Amino acid sequence: MKTRLIIFLMCLFAWFSGADTHAQTDVKHLSWGKVANNMPTEWYNSEQARNIADQLLARQMDCGGWQKNIPYHHLLTDAELAKVRRTGVGATIDNGATTTEMRFLARVYACCGDARYKDAFVKGLHYLFEAQYDNGGWPQFNPPRGKAHYSSHITYNDNAMVNVLRLLREVSENDSPFDGLRLSDSLREQAQKSFDKGIDCILKTQIRIDGKPTVWCAQHDEKTFAPAPARAYELVSFSGS
């Protein structure tokens, strides 16, 4: 009996040691996209993942979106967090921003059930709804980066709209990891309607030559649907990017 108890305690100690080691995985060398989407499922229940989620809450802009090209898994100090700007221009769907952060929060919430993470996700979802034009398209930034700036164009470049549409479809169909959020039927229905409008916009912006549908530009004018330029080297073209 004593031998069995010793073996049990040794196994229990080994399990906790292994869990702690796994929870403190070195993620700094990984990309933010990898950390947000491709870690082992159990890792999203770790203290390390929750610390990152807490940073996402602190760095979510007041409009509900997030800024781009930021390695959110590199944690800031309290002093640095106090200087983070949460208002004005900055929230975007460019380069995977906002949708990536929402996916991460959904995964962490599914594991730990902290309501703050769900609330932040829902706030991000409303940001996507509000940023969508009546014609179904999304600008690169919302609010846009200045008057007559290309960031107000309907943006396909860098999978901006595709990332949003994919997330909305998965939310509406209650796919993983969003099923763990237990979103209301009304929210999922709104996601479906937003998705449908987005698909309709894609059809409207397709370039037609002699009445025949062809391809798309990287961005299109939000009012006329015509191909539109962006940066100086991103001219109107029959291209994807």
Q: What are these language model-derived features?
A:
Residues S31-Y44, I52, L57-A58, T99-D114, ...:
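Well-ordered alpha-helical scaffold segments within catalytic/enzyme domains
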Residues P71-V89, P139-N159, K212-S239:
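Carbohydrate-binding/catalytic loop surfaces
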Residues I52-G64, A120-G137, Q192-G211:
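Long, well-ordered core segments of solenoidal/helical folds
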Residues I7-S17:
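Bacterial N-terminal signal peptides
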Residues K118, L125, F129, I154, ...:
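Eukaryote-skewed repeat-based solenoidal scaffolds used as protein-protein interaction platforms
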Residues G18-A23:
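Sec/Tat signal peptide C-region and signal peptidase I cleavage site
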Residues Y44-Q48, T92-T100, T155-R166, Q190, ...:
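Aromatic- and histidine-enriched alpha-helix N-cap/loop-to-helix transition segments
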Residues Q24-G88, I209-K212:
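Low-complexity, Ser/Thr/Pro/Gly-enriched N-terminal "stalk/linker" regions
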